[in-house]
C-alpha cells in the first residue's frame, strides 16, 4: 500500500459540494483514507478522538472558522504538529499572515484544480515520511 493511501486526511468545509470536490481531488491523487467534517468544531472533536495526518480546511465556516480551527489544532498538544492547509475563496493577505504566524503550512485559492492541490501537498507529504 502506498504512503498516500495510508495517510488519513481530514477535509473541513461547511459546503457539501466543496467537501466532495476536495475529496474527489484527493482520491484522484491517490489518497484513500479521507474523513470529512462540516465545521471546525466537528473537526476538532474528530482530531481529539481519531487524529488525522493532514487537515485541509475551508477558511470561512460557521461556529469555528479555519484560523480558529488552526489555532485549536496548534494549541492541543497531540495535534500541534499536524500539517494544515487552508482553502479560501478570497485570499486576504492579513488573514494569511495571521495563519502563517499560527503555523499554517499552505493555502489554496478556490476554485483550484487537482494539480494545484498536488503541488501544495507534495512538500508536506515528503516531510511526513
Each language-model region and where it sits:
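Receiver (REC) domain active-site loop signature in two-component systems and cognate sites
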Residues: 61
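Acidic catalytic/metal-coordinating carboxylates
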Residues: 39-42, 65-71
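Active-site residues of response regulator receiver
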Residues: 58, 88
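C-terminal output helix
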Residues: 112-122
Amino acid at each position: 500500500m502506498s504512503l498516500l493511501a495510508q495517510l488519513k486526511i481530514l477535509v473541513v468545509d461547511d459546503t457539501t459540494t466543496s467537501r466532495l470536490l476536495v475529496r474527489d481531488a484527493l482520491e484522484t491523487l491517490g489518497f484513500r483514507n479521507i474523513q470529512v467534517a462540516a465545521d471546525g468544531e466537528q473537526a476538532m472533536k474528530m482530531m481529539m478522538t481519531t487524529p488525522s495526518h493532514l487537515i485541509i480546511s475551508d477558511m470561512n465556516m460557521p461556529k469555528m472558522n479555519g484560523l480558529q480551527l488552526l489555532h485549536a489544532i496548534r494549541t492541543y498538544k497531540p495535534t500541534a504538529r499536524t500539517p494544515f492547509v487552508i482553502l479560501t475563496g478570497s485570499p486576504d493577505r492579513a488573514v494569511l499572515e495571521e495563519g502563517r504566524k499560527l503555523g499554517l503550512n499552505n493555502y489554496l485559492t478556490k476554485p483550484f484544480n487537482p494539480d494545484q492541490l498536488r503541488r501544495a501537498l507534495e512538500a508536506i507529504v515528503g516531510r511526513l515520511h
